[in-house]
Each structure stands twice: as C-alpha cells, then as structure tokens.
Amino acid sequence: MAGLETTPEMFDLRMSEEVRPLFDAVTKFIAEEVDPHTNEFFRLGESREERWGYGEGQLELLDSIKAKAKEQGLWNFFLPDAETGEGLKNLDYAYIATELGKNPIASQSLNCSAPDTGNMEVLERVGTPEQKEQWLTPLLNGEIRSAYAMTEPDIPSSDAKNISCSAILDGDEWVINGEKFYISGAGDPRCKIMICMVQTNPDGPPHKRQSQILVPMDNPGVEILGPCHVFGKDDAPHGHMHLRFNDCRVPKDNILLGEGRGFEISQVRLGPGRIHHCMRSIGAAERAIEMMVKRGLTREAFGKPIASLGKNIEVIAKARIEIESMRRMVLTAAKAMDELGNEAARVWVSAVKAMVPIRVCHIIDEAIQFHGAAGVSQWTPLADMYTSQRTLRLADGPDEVHWFVVGRAELRRWEEEGGIKYDPKADYYSKDS
C-alpha cells in the first residue's frame, strides 16, 4: 500500500468479539471508579506544599484506583505482547483508548498513559533482560513514571538527523553532553528513568548517527533548568522540562538495541505512540460534544435553549460528523498497522496525526464558545483539554511533517502507476466537443 489506499479487508473495523467483555469492563470501571474521584484528585492537588509534588492524599487516591484496576485485570492494554500486556490488536485497543481519552486520569489509572506507554513498548521489544528487570518491571507495575528526551532547543527537532546532544564512549561509560527541552513528565517526582536520543557517531550515515540510551533521572549529570511553559502554564507537577546534560555518565550497557540504531527504535516507539494519542483525542472530542450538548439544552438565552439559537445546532451536527469521520480514520489506521505492520502503515498514521488534533481542537473551541467565559475558566476542563490537543499538534512530529508524508506518498503512487504527464487541456471539455 503506497498511500491512503484501502483494500476490502480494510473495511471491517469491528471490535473483536473476544475483546467486547474487556471493553465493557473498562467502560464500567471508568464510570464507577475513576469518574467519581477525578475532581477530588485535582482538589487534593491544590493543597500541595511543593510546586513539583503532590498534595496530601492525592497519590494515595490514585494508587487505590490503580490497585482496583490491577486486581480486575484492567492493566497495560497497550502492549501487543500477550505475556506483558493484553495482546490486543491495535484496532481493538483503539476502542478502549477512546474511552480512556474521556477522563484526564483514566489512562494513569489503568497504567496506559504517555510517555510511559511508548517507553514500555520500546523496553519490551528491544531491552535486554537486565534493562527489563530494572526499568520495565516497575513501569509495568505502575510504581514509577518515565520520560522520553528527544527535542532540543537549538535545532529543528522535527528532523531527527539534526540531534546534537552527544554521547561519547569513555571506557565502560557513555558521557552525555547537551540540552533537551519540552521533556514531558520529567518534572514528576515519580519519574525515575528517561530514554534519551543522542548522537554517538557524527561522521556516520545520516540515519546511523543516533542512538538511544537509558538515563536515570537522579544521575548527577542531569540538571533540570526549569519548566517550559505551555500557554503560560508550567503544567506542574507533570511538567515539560528543560534539561542539561553535564558530562552525564551512564554505563555502556544502558544503550538500547545497539549503537547507531536510534532511528530504528523511534519507529518502534513513535508509530504506535502517534496513533494512541489520536485514539485518546477522539475520547476528548466526545467529552467536548457531551459538554456542548448539555450546556446547549440546559442554558437559556432570550427565552430559548442556547442550542436552538443561531447556528448552534449546526455546530453540534458538524462536531458529531467530524468525530465519526475521525473515528473511522483512526480505526482504519489501526487496522492498517495490524494488517500491514507499523512501517507499511505509516502513511495512515501520519494522516490521522495530521488531521485529528486539528479537528479536535476545533470541536473543543466550539464547546468553549457554548460555555462563554466559563469555557476558559478553572471551572470546566475545556481550557486544559484545548491546551493538550493544541500541544499534540507539535508532539511526535508537527503537522507539516505528516502532511508531507501523506502528500509524498500520493505523488509517488501516481508516478508508479504510469508516470503521469499532466496536460491541463485534457482535463476539460471544450464547448465544441
């Protein structure tokens, strides 16, 4: 499949019957165990004494929910390996991830939140037994959090060949120097490990210069310069941190897969990560339209429900149409990953990554408009939802990179089907024909 072509087997986007009970159990668990405690979780956070910490009882509340989820077997759905996860197909996980996206702490509660999901998948696929024991096991158990350090402040990181943070082998240790910024989750006190993309062979072929190395957060060579703000907020205690590596020494064995294989690992991590983000984004859009409809039916202006005023009913209709269109695109991308593999399906993944966050931002923006000033206040989740989705347009590759991937694939498809020679006159009927 060269581009966004579909084959007959791609049209069956139904959830597997054997996964239906699991999906129902997840939906029920979120409704009964997560939703009722979400406001309390954030309320407890308001009383924290340290900016980069948690309030009294906050983590205990979350841990109690996680314990119930683990006890019921609702844990680590995202991993394709049946031994460490549920062994779900991407298509089946898409339905579950959509439900997770409706609540801001649902993914954490079921140990399916980024960036841990991508890091766990990398460790599960390419980690050594020692790396798995030290880092994958506590991540799978939900005991620690992690970060992924790729973006740098002084280079366009959308082209990963530009990565300049260096790692030089000195005896049995890698010595890392350089800076990373907007490293999500690195401010969380539970974050104990990060996977760092570094340049290990500056003179090698462009796609063989980079490697990925495990760096403990408590390494004395890791300096946290401070949080990078998003729309004026520091997003504490999660945070998007600016890091500096000052002669940061880690064991030689901390390298993942081998020297010069950083790009290869990125494909393991970023492909599934991108589509998982988009799956959860569909859930956020569902939350936004639900809030929009409830507001529209229960608030009156000029003697009428605001849903019936002006073009508001059209706004609701368009939001529903867009959600269902996005849902089908995401499910098709997930199906392509299952049927063709991650590499062959990357055009589909780029398509949904380019489309979904933009449209979800638009739907949330309309929901904000329905709520008036309350829509941008601390009294609704809409402002945070919008910020998250707008940030997603930059995470794991900006929109423009993904538009380029899709457009290039379409051009190549036509070229491969006969070397198109365009004659504008041939595409129009003359009045005399």
Task: Indicate where each model-derived feature is located.
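Flexible, small-/acidic-enriched active-site or ligand-binding loops
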Residues: 162, 218-249
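N-terminal glycine-rich flavin-associated loop
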Residues: 110-130, 159
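Alpha-helical interface subdomain recognition
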Residues: 1-104, 113, 126-131, 138-143, ...
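Short Ser/Thr-interspersed hydrophobic loop/turn segments at strand-loop and sheet-helix junctions
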Residues: 73, 96-102, 197-199, 214-222, ...
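A short, Trp-centered hydrophobic/proline-enriched beta-strand micro-motif
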Residues: 142-151, 197
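A short core secondary-structure module
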Residues: 172-173, 177-225
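Long, acidic (Asp/Glu-rich), low-complexity accessory segments flanking structured domains
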Residues: 247-264
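Short Gly/Pro-enriched turn/cap motifs at secondary-structure boundaries
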Residues: 154-158, 185-189, 202-204, 230-239
